């Protein structure tokens, strides 16, 4: 295939900085195996495939906001899990504290 150039990709994005962000995010998606290439990847590495997809107009800056929304949802879920874990830890500590008091009372009585 012909070489993909930055100039060709810039026709589809605002500037070079946005191009880097979009290409990096897409390459990470491809390399992690969570997403399939939208073009025939052949033997190209994920970075090249990402740039080819941008050049073809298949991937744009919306990929960045989609990831942000998913990250926010995961963050909210993590906060709920953290609060559940914290309450379990507090319950465990309160039981341990009661056991310790009972042990101390038993020692005094002996």
UniProtKB/Swiss-Prot annotation:
Cellular-component GO terms for this entry: DNA-directed RNA polymerase complex
SMART domains (UniProt xref): RNA_pol_Rpb6
Endpoints of the signal sequence: none
GO biological process: DNA-templated transcription
Superkingdom as given in the UniProt entry: Bacteria
InterPro entries: DNA-dir_RNA_pol_omega, Pol_omega/Rpo6/RPB6, RPB6/omega-like_sf
Catalytic activity: RNA(n) + a ribonucleoside 5'-triphosphate = RNA(n+1) + diphosphate
Coiled-coil ranges from the UniProt annotation: none
Gene3D superfamilies: 3.90.940.10
Pfam families: RNA_pol_Rpb6 (PF01192)
UniProt keywords, alphabetically: DNA-directed RNA polymerase, Nucleotidyltransferase, Transcription, Transferase
Primary enzyme class: transferase
Keyword Nucleotidyltransferase found: yes
EC numbers, comma separated: 2.7.7.6
GO molecular function: DNA binding; DNA-directed RNA polymerase activity
Family statement drawn from the similarity comment of this UniProt entry: Belongs to the RNA polymerase subunit omega family.
HAMAP family reported in the protein's UniProt record: RNApol_bact_RpoZ (MF_00366)
Subunit description: The RNAP catalytic core consists of 2 alpha, 1 beta, 1 beta' and 1 omega subunit. When a sigma factor is associated with the core the holoenzyme is formed, which can initiate transcription.
Physiological role: Promotes RNA polymerase assembly. Latches the N- and C-terminal regions of the beta' subunit thereby facilitating its interaction with the beta and alpha subunits.
Protein known as: DNA-directed RNA polymerase subunit omega
Source organism (scientific name): Vesicomyosocius okutanii subsp. Calyptogena okutanii (strain HA)
Gene name of this polypeptide: rpoZ
């Amino acid at each position: 295939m012909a070489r993909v150039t930055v100039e060709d990709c810039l026709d589809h994005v605002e500037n070079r900085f946005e191009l880097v962000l979009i290409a990096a995010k897409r390459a990470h998606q491809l390399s992690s195996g969570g997403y399939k290439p939208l073009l025939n990847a052949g033997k190209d590495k994920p970075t090249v495939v990402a740039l080819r997809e941008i050049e073809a107009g298949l991937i744009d800056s919306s990929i960045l906001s989609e990831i942000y929304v998913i990250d926010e949802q995961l963050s909210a879920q993590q906060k709920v899990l953290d609060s559940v874990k914290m309450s379990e830890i507090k319950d465990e500590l309160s039981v341990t504290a009661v056991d310790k008091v009972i042990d101390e009372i038993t020692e005094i009585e002996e």
